[in-house]
A protein has these predicted regions:
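N-terminal [4Fe-4S]-dependent radical SAM core
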Residues: 1-87, 325-326
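Auxiliary Fe-S-binding modules of radical SAM enzymes
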Residues: 2-16, 20-25, 215, 223-326
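Hydrophobic faces of well-ordered beta-strands that scaffold small-molecule active sites
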Residues: 25-29, 86-88, 119-121, 145-149, ...
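Structural recognition of alpha->loop->beta junctions
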Residues: 47, 109-116, 203-218, 291-305
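Core AdoMet radical
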Residues: 53-73, 77-100, 115-128, 144-171, ...
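Generic structural signal for well-ordered alpha-helices
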Residues: 67-74, 103-108, 133-137, 171-175, ...
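Acidic (Asp/Glu)-rich catalytic clusters
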Residues: 77-79, 106-114, 134-144, 176-180
Length: 326
């Protein structure tokens, strides 16, 4: 097969086109939640790597209503794509960690904003009570809905070290329960967490492939100023491997994707943080520049998603904007 026609991996824009005949953009929201490993329920201080300022746009302020945040987010994109529609992305902290009626009000307020065509709800695998899941199951019948779980690692030792406050068994249960309700279920993982080797991380792809995940976000570990992990790095830098050369990370990602189930949609490969907060790694690349390098390297290696996945019998290819298999 000609490598130029092959779909190197299942990408998110192609996935969205299955649901929407128009351009769709996520708008991040900060709805004023916290996390059980921050407020003392399961721990204090939150995840050791976390500083929510790294992914909250300027319009995300808890003193602003959901409607105001969405309207300001729309203004940010409208000048370039006036016909664009939006997904309200409840991103900051744990967006299911509150009383049910309050959650319903926030979700439903977002859906009343003109141009909002669905919800993406980011949360933890230990914060999906049955009552909320039943509500989301019903909501899913009326609007586009995706629940995105912060998995971060499949290794319980790592999860404990980074103060997640949950286990991988919690992830398995939450993902299975959510997907069983017919809800699109996504995951988020971090490559390069302390104590994890190249082989450990690549093996993780096969483990996650056993779950009914529709999408997966991958990103590199970033050291962020003011976090507990940044302090740990100052104390013992030898315990960290930060992919200071982008080529090393690209090759790891390719190895990972080759072992990933072919139908999982890979939503992203890297995270970007404000320069004033980022300690390392700083590759000086925009997301599209990273993706271009990744795709070039995949073609050089003859790599594609699922190439080494244990149950892979078909190759997914891309031709004339249509997904096909051979």
């Amino acid at each position: 097969m000609n490598m130029s026609t092959q779909l190197l991996y299942n990408d998110f824009p192609t996935f969205l086109r299955k649901y929407f005949p128009y351009k769709v953009q996520k708008i991040s929201l900060n709805a004023g939640f916290t996390c059980p490993n921050r407020d003392g329920t399961k721990g204090w201080g939150g995840c050791t790597y976390c500083n929510n300022q790294t992914f909250n746009p300027d319009y995300c302020r808890t003193e602003k209503s959901i409607t105001t945040q969405l309207e300001e987010g729309k203004c940010f994109f409208a000048h370039k794509y006036p016909e664009m529609k939006y997904l309200a992305y409840f991103q900051a902290y744990t967006n299911t960690y509150a009383e049910l009626e309050g959650l319903k009000r926030k979700y439903e307020e977002a859906l009343t904003v003109d141009g909002a065509v669905g919800l993406v709800i980011g949360t933890r695998p230990d914060c999906m009570p049955e009552s909320l899941l039943r509500y989301l199951e019903e909501l899913n019948k009326h609007t586009f809905l995706m629940v995105e779980y912060g998995i971060e690692s499949t290794c319980d030792e790592t999860l404990k070290r980074i103060n997640r406050g949950h286990t991988y068994a919690d992830t398995v249960e939450a993902v299975q329960r959510t997907a069983a309700c017919g809800i699109l279920t996504g995951g988020h993982i971090i490559l390069g967490l302390p104590g994890e080797t190249h082989d450990t991380m690549v093996a993780q792809a096969e483990i996650l492939s056993d779950l009914p995940l529709a999408t997966l976000k991958i990103h590199q570990l970033q050291l962020i100023r003011g976090t507990r992990m940044a302090h740990e790095y100052d104390e013992a830098p030898d315990g960290f491997y930060l992919f200071n050369e982008v080529e090393e990370y690209i090759d790891l990602v390719i190895d990972y994707v080759e072992h990933l189930r072919p139908d999982i949609v890979v939503e992203r490969f890297v995270s970007q943080s404000p320069k004033d907060l980022l300690i390392a790694p700083d590759w000086g690349l925009k997301n599209y520049e990273f993706v271009a390098r990744l795709q070039k390297r995949m073609k050089e290696r003859g790599a594609y998603q699922g190439k080494k996945y244990r149950d892979s019998e078909k190759r997914i290819i891309f031709a004339d904007d249509k997904l096909t298999t051979e």
